[in-house]
Amino acid sequence: MKAFGGYHPAVTFTYFISVLLTAMFVWNPVIQLTALLGGIMFSLMLVRKKAVLSDMGFYLPLFLLVAVTNPLFSHNGVTPLFFMNGNPVTLEAVVYGVFISVMVVGVLFWCKCDNEIMTEDKFLYLFGRIIPKMSLVLSMALRFVPMFKRQMKNVSRAQKAMGLYSQKSYVDRLRGGIRVFTAMISWSLENSMELSSSMRARGYGLHGRTNFSLFKFGARDAAVLLSGLLLFAAVLIGVGSGSIDFTFYPELGKISLSLKSLITYISFFILSFLPFFIEVKENLKWKYYISKI
């Protein structure tokens, strides 16, 4: 189910902007771990567990790469753990590398959730009248990667059905991969030109053109939007007051547990898990109604 996707596009767009801005620019371990966990839990509600595990198979090597690379190239910090080729590998650099990895993976999970909820029609609805060309480009970019992956699988299956690169040698696989990739480049260029011509023929972006939409802003949309904005405002106040500031260099700081910082942590926790709570609530409601049939 995608219960959160049933809310007004302005609500979901504002929510994702709030979470992503916090996850990208608030350098606090508690905030980053909360964002990562919230993104994972929301992803599990939106897509199949197999797809989430597949994503983790890609994110885990990325996590390790970033976490290991930073202490090898950055030697800042006052707590050396050991020396490699005469250069110190410091505790601060290791923690900073892990922190960056958590931030990157968390943002990737939230971007995936955003891609599942904010479909191209919602972007066109929100920005089609204000910035029609930019909204068209954004909607095309959002749908490009999933379409590219689906089309690549179709082309690969079609060529395998024709008997191409059926051998198991690495050279044959490489040739087949190059052939599929070449076909995909041609397909993507042709598809973008056809879409642009189609939208132009329909009068997209012309002044005075009306749009049909099924989106209506109701009371529940107002409630979720107001709740999200209040929680985001609480996070911004906490960040602005410096209550959750955390330093990595020259030595690791301490995680603040003051009243202001706790309010900030709790506010962001509720904000990042808000769609998860909504999905769980709708699932329970659905199961309850099914049990009454």
Residues of each region from the PLM?
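Structural signal for the C-terminal ends of transmembrane alpha-helices
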Residues: 41-49, 117-118, 276-281
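Alpha-helical transmembrane segments and their membrane-interface exit regions
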Residues: 38-47, 62-67
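Transmembrane alpha-helix interface motif
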Residues: 2-40, 154, 158-293
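Juxtamembrane/interface alpha-helical elements of multi-pass membrane proteins
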Residues: 55-171, 284-293
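Membrane-helix interfacial "entry" motifs
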Residues: 1-5, 47-51, 84-96, 217
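Interfacial helix-loop-helix linkers and transmembrane-helix boundary segments
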Residues: 33, 48-57
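Short helix-capping/hinge motifs at transmembrane helix termini and TM-loop junctions
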Residues: 27, 46-47, 74
